[in-house]
Amino acid sequence: GLVLGIYSSEKDEGAAQFTSAGDAFDRLVSGKLRELLSVCGPPLKKGKTRIFHGLHQDFPSVVVVGLGKKNAGVNEQENWNEGKENIRAAVAVGCRQIQDLEIPCVEVDPCGDAQAAAEGAVLGLHEYNELKQKKKPVVTPQLHGSAESEAWQKGVIYAEGQNLSRYLMEAPANYITPVKFAEHIEQKLRSFSNVKVHIRPESWIATQQMGAFLSVAKGSAEPPIFLEIHYLGGANTNDSPLVFVGKGVTFDSGGISLKPSSGMDAMRADMGGAATVCSAIVTAAALNLPLNIIGLAPLCENMPSGKANKPGDVVRAKNGKTIQVDNTDAEGRLLLADALCYAHNFNARAIVNAATLTGAMDVALGSAATGVFTNSSWLWTHLYEASILTGDRVWRMPLFEHYTKQVTDCPLADLSNIGKYSRAGGACTAAAFLKEFVTASHWAHLDIAGVMSNKDEVPYLRKGMAGRPTRTLVEFAARLSQDSHN
């Protein structure tokens, strides 16, 4: 199969304009493609397709996809590069049509941006069907022509990184337990000589005095793991690393503060923070990015049992602060509190944590963007600029003292794990809670609860767990590796 792009005609130009690959193919079939397009309905709109069979012996089926305006660039209103997004969406829908025809290979027009085209193809074809007997046919996307093969390959690596997090998030919680999560990541990193993976057991966690993390883990029969990854891509192994921290709750029932049963199965993806940061490191290693990265993922389940945290219990975090656990379902911040304390051991250039932390984040921004709470404008600028390119957007949220007061005003301990006014500003009080465990001057907390899954909002992702914002983290790390400022 073959997927070719076509731009929508500007008002006066009349005939729609092919990409250069589309033009070349049209010449190859003596203008037949343009002729067929002109007689088979209105001009192709952005994201719409036409499919033609039997035009050329090498390509039994050719899908023409609408790319929208030719010179679409950064859209200030939308905070993304519209041209790139249009290519991703169009290529994804074209590749899926080839897949529906059970054609095993598809060649993709680079559409002027081979990286975006590769991302659209690889992300658009991904589906989790490991556990089904009846599987969709596997389709391998390849670049049509050889002009932009380096950019294409980069796009494939970026997209495979996001697909790895989608896989980890989508898989059932009895398949991706804390131990199996860690083993899966270790196996992905085994071939890189500049990566060390430490799978720390419960006994190690206890010696580190991570009392908040352990208090959550003790409710489950699954043993907790603290996963620590060292990627040494920098010129000097002693260069200050970028530290990623990801919440790794492989299943979140809520604990004694039990969640409603409807939709609880989606909580198999409550390790989305760990999945995205670990996948970003796997991708950084595949791209051989020239910087050092450390990944930290506290992994456990949050379950109700005779051993579980009870509402009102007080636990002690690694830095000695005590926390009153007023709601056992605000557990992600307990794991992150200890992991953030530990992250300060590495003289980090920046600490970036990701977590499916609060339903309130989903209420605030929905799935349009990841909420970013940060104490560093320098860090924010890098994350924001990266997100414009990837189309996986971020939006800055407040870290006001206003919210800190609501978590420090606590009857029995230094901090309460939910804000004084419970639901009001829930994403912001959670961020304020985390800030109590951070002394680093460049720290960002990404609340990814709203972007955890995709219904149909992102056209190049199928319905299911989204693996967002993995590509933005990778692009951010790539930009950081070029920035000597700090």
What feature does the model see in each segment?
Residues 1-248:
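Short amphipathic alpha-helical segment within the helicase RecA-like ATPase core
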